[in-house]
């Protein structure tokens, strides 16, 4: 185990390039969430829902934004104050105190199978039983995990991290600093079939590629299919969660986020800075503009041309959903009022009948 690191609060502030308030000699040797932090931990407040813990936490220091420091700075606590985004400073603390766990298999393991035509860069790690097929190209300082397969003519850029049991099929192009979690399959054939006169389904050849640009992250057991003729493309900086299905010839823009179990059907184009909530389904052959947020379990059946928050099935603006939900919640009271009106109408009807038969 690595030796425990200890910083004074002032040393930590200097490393993070932030302001410090409180006892600058407080020793800090670890990180923890605000509700469980002890005296040797640094923690942070990112969500105001957890502000109640500021008074009771035992943390040696709390990372706050300047706005938060104005609200809570009067408390007798040690604070590290950043301009904004405490979670970013906290992530830097995590990197300081917690080193990644090494697999223990440096270099190229003797059980790895590497085709003689493959090109392997400098300082590459290829773990046991990984397979690198013909004419594949692995960039410098890239890591290929145990049992992973890199297909023929596929390329990976520098500083990529391919975890165990990943399959990268043939002719896939992957940029720099891409992270692929275990079980992901990149470049499988799309779900394209033609049905003949006898009702039998015949699979169509898919000749396109999958192109993954720089700084993309792909979650565990996520699948990205190649296009039939054109390429499936994941643009720079996009983050994809676990168990996401991206069909043939889909294009996802820059710096978007796709949450677990979402599915995007073929030939759909997703814009930049789009957030797709968990279990969202998006039909094929449509486009989603930039800066759209889709809530969990949204069903998107038509193109979205205006930025904003959408939800429901079929997808519609959040404000519209909010109004509809409010009306639904009022239905029991409306039903009660309707029942009372019906009773009054019955009473009035009975009185009218009595008046009609009175001589």
Swiss-Prot record:
Transmembrane segments: none annotated. GO terms for cellular component: membrane. Pathway: Bacterial outer membrane biogenesis; LPS lipid A biosynthesis. One of its GO terms (biological process) is lipid A biosynthetic process. Keywords: Acyltransferase, Lipid A biosynthesis, Lipid biosynthesis, Lipid metabolism, Repeat, Transferase. It comes from the Bacteria. It catalyses: a UDP-3-O-[(3R)-3-hydroxyacyl]-alpha-D-glucosamine + a (3R)-hydroxyacyl-[ACP] = a UDP-2-N,3-O-bis[(3R)-3-hydroxyacyl]-alpha-D-glucosamine + holo-[ACP] + H(+). InterPro entries: Hexapep (IPR001451), LpxD (IPR007691), Trimer_LpxA-like_sf (IPR011004), UDP_GlcNAc_AcTrfase_non-rep (IPR020573). The active site is at 248 (proton acceptor). Its EC number is 2.3.1.191. GO terms for molecular function: N-acyltransferase activity. Homotrimer. Belongs to the transferase hexapeptide repeat family. LpxD subfamily. Catalyzes the N-acylation of UDP-3-O-acylglucosamine using 3-hydroxyacyl-ACP as the acyl donor. Is involved in the biosynthesis of lipid A, a phosphorylated glycolipid that anchors the lipopolysaccharide to the outer membrane of the cell. This is UDP-3-O-acylglucosamine N-acyltransferase.
């Amino acid at each position: 185990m690595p030796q425990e690191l200890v910083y004074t609060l002032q040393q930590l502030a200097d490393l993070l390039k932030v302001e410090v308030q409180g006892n600058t000699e407080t020793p800090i040797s670890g990180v923890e969430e605000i509700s469980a932090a002890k005296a040797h931990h640094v923690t942070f407040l990112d969500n105001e829902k957890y502000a109640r813990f500021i008074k009771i936490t035992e943390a040696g220091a709390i990372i706050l934004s300047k706005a938060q420091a104005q609200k809570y700075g009067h408390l007798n606590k040690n604070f590290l104050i950043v301009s904004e985004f405490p979670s970013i400073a906290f992530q830097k603390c995590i990197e300081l105190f917690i080193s990644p766990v090494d697999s223990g298999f440096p270099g190229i393991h003797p059980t790895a199978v590497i085709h003689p035509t493959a090109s392997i860069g400098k300082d590459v790690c290829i773990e046991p039983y990984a397979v690198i097929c013909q004419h594949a190209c692995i960039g410098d300082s890239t890591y290929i995990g145990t049992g992973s397969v890199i297909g023929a003519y596929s390329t990976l850029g520098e500083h990529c991290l391919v975890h165990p049991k990943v399959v990268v099929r043939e002719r896939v192009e992957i940029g720099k600093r891409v992270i692929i979690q275990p079980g992901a399959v990149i470049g499988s054939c799309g779900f394209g079939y033609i049905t003949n006169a006898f009702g039998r389904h015949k699979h169509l050849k898919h000749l396109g590629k999958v192109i993954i640009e720089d700084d993309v992250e792909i979650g565990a057991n996520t699948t990205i299919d190649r296009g039939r003729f054109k390429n499936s493309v994941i643009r720079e900086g996009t983050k994809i969660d676990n168990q996401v299905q991206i069909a043939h010839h889909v294009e996802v823009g820059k710096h978007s986020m796709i949450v677990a179990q979402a599915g995007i059907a073929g030939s759909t184009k997703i814009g930049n800075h789009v957030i797709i909530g968990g279990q969202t389904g998006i039909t094929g052959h449509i486009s989603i503009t930039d800066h759209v947020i889709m809530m969990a379990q949204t069903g998107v059946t038509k193109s979205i041309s205006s930025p904003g928050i959408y939800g429901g099935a079929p997808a519609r603006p959040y404000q519209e959903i909010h109004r509809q939900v409010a009306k639904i919640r009022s239905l029991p009271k409306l039903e009660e009022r309707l029942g009372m009106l019906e009773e009054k109408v019955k009473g009035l009807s009975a009185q009218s009948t009595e008046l009609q038969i009175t001589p």
